[in-house]
Amino acid sequence: MPRIDDELSPLQLNRFQQLRHFLTIEGLSRKHLTDILDTADTFIEVGSRSIKKVPLLRGKTVANLFFEASTRTRTTFELAAKRLSADVLNINITTSATSKGESLSDMLRNLEAMAVDMFVVRHAQSGAPHFIAKSVTPRVSVINAGDGRHAHPTQAMLDMLTIRQHKHKFEGLKVAIVGDILHSRVARSQIQALNLLGAEEVRVIAPDTLLPPYIDQFGVKVFSSMKEGMRDVDVVIMLRLQKERMEGALLPSEQEFFRLYGLSQDKLALAKPDAIVMHPGPINRGVEIESAVADGPQSVILNQVTNGIAVRMAVMSMAMSGQIAELTADEEVA
């Protein structure tokens, strides 16, 4: 695994071992993850209220800094912050001063001068949220909304919440992650979370060209065949082919990929009868999954989207609580 995580682990916790930033799954305890899931559970019903608000971040300002395109992640972070009663800034990177040559550090300093309390960051460069978390003052928390190939911890946690809702526990579960493992920050975070939460077996199914060279360090079983890898699994997680990150001819064609690794009803029949089907989105129908499966009775893909709001509410509220606890302790010492 990339060693960015060695520095991230202590950085994201305060002196009381509470979340201060949320940058990666690596280095957190099972209790940290279950606390996030349990907190998210309490926020799910907020979405069904006539007034979808709780006051936990009232008076706080959250800035969404998305240096990569996003629909679901950016929108659910915005909804999460607003449902927590925060003020939200959506920074348009293409029209911001960074497009005129302003450095990221200067941009952050200016936003801090405006008393922004939290940055939600998506960046193409692995480790960018880590750099930002190290750079900001103690009055700012940083949430990683996906960095390069490195990590996407909130996506992993909304996936864990979805699995727990449908399977009730992680012990005894066999989970298959299928597709572009090489370029997927989602897969890395999912694998870390599943292993930490006690899944019996995590499988990855992919052609050799879409596996990272250090896959043996992930704590997974590797399969090159759907016929073998799908057998008797409880959960199937399909991944998007990340063509924007691919260099060279890693695939003969999308049609050939679907024939070998796309999830059809025939391939899904190899899994357990009550297996659930997941996908982090966006879906490429007919490439990694066929419509009959994506829209079928075993699909929980839209459930994942709904859970994304609750999980991001949980992470943001917990990080803010960790920030406040640290600041309060510092003031008492002073």
Swiss-Prot record:
Signal peptide: none annotated. SUPFAM superfamilies: Aspartate/ornithine carbamoyltransferase. It catalyses: carbamoyl phosphate + L-aspartate = N-carbamoyl-L-aspartate + phosphate + H(+). InterPro entries: Asp/Orn_carbamoyltranf_P-bd (IPR006132), Asp/Orn_carbamoylTrfase (IPR006130), Asp/Orn_carbamoylTrfase_sf (IPR036901), Asp_carbamoyltransf (IPR002082), Asp_carbamoyltransf_Asp/Orn-bd (IPR006131). GO terms for cellular component: cytosol. Belongs to the aspartate/ornithine carbamoyltransferase superfamily. ATCase family. This is Aspartate carbamoyltransferase catalytic subunit. It comes from Hahella chejuensis (strain KCTC 2396). The lineage of its organism: Bacteria, Pseudomonadati, Pseudomonadota, Gammaproteobacteria, Oceanospirillales.
